[in-house]
Amino acid sequence: MYSGNKVVISWIVSIGFVGMPEFMSSKTFALCRQRSFLHGPAGIRSDEEKENNFFGRVSFMDAALLLEYGWVLLVLIGLEGILAADNALVMAVMVKHLPEEKRKKALFYGLAGAFVLRFGSLFAISFLVNVWQVQAIGAIYLLYISASHLLKRYVFKKEDTHKETKQSGFWPTVLKVELADIAFAVDSILAAVALAVTLPGTSLPKIGGLDGGQFLVILAGGIIGLVIMRFAASMFVKLLKERPSLETAAFVIVGWVGVKLALYTLAHRDIAVVSEHFIHSGTWKLIFWGVLAAIAVCGWFMSGGKKQPEGAQNEQKNSTRERA
């Protein structure tokens, strides 16, 4: 009964189309009549339904893509913020021996260099990722900075003050800061690329060997990281004055970042000493960030407050006795 009614309705609709050719083109009229004859009235609406379903799927895919990109961007902002804070801490340590005016200038040059180098490295992503020598130089320099400071402080205690006076010039300090910026820029861009390449591709043109959407995520994360560095550098200079022993923890962190860069270098496909799978695994990320957090926490609690000179302590004791 239902199929008979369907055929009747189909014929009625098809007959009705005979009186409607002036409102549509002959091609559209023929198509509608054919579909009404074969599939009934539902066939007329099938194109519209398919179109709605298609746009529904597209909008869902767009929303999912935006959510995925947004989540990775948030993670990248946090990561770049931590690396920028490390970079700012190293700059603060390197310039703290300078007079106030020169210290501000050295910090300005260091921040300007960090801006230029990180933006430059964005457009040389393919070069930085494929050439392991660049990664190796950055790793060696960070390890050298860390080892040099720790050896001077805890092994060659007598030579430490003499060498510091020799290396307290303004421009040598700026040069050291810029070299550290290069190493941190390489580490930052490698970390950003490792996150961004996990994102699905977009229709945007490629930039620097990367998909346009992935590149924009790295760019946004890098800019926010630089803004964090701008404000963190001055804060760390003040913090190091209050907690001088925190400087040792800062150099241990520098060495640990150097170890990370060294492992990235050894995992390069041209060397392949370390498994590339291990470098990108959750186990290594957990180890790296866990050790980094442990160094920071231990350094904070072990540094304590700034010790007062003996003269100041005696004056404070005398004043308390007089009050008593």
Curated annotation (Swiss-Prot):
Disulfide bonds: none annotated. Signal peptide: none annotated. It comes from the Bacteria. The chain crosses the membrane at residues 4-24, 63-83, 106-128, 132-151, 179-199, 209-229, 246-266, 282-302. It is found in: Cell membrane. Coiled coil: none annotated. GO terms for cellular component: plasma membrane. It is a multi-pass membrane protein. Keywords: Cell membrane, Membrane, Transmembrane, Transmembrane helix. PANTHER family: MEMBRANE BOUND PREDICTED REDOX MODULATOR, SLL1022 PROTEIN. Belongs to the TerC family. This is Uncharacterized membrane protein YkoY.
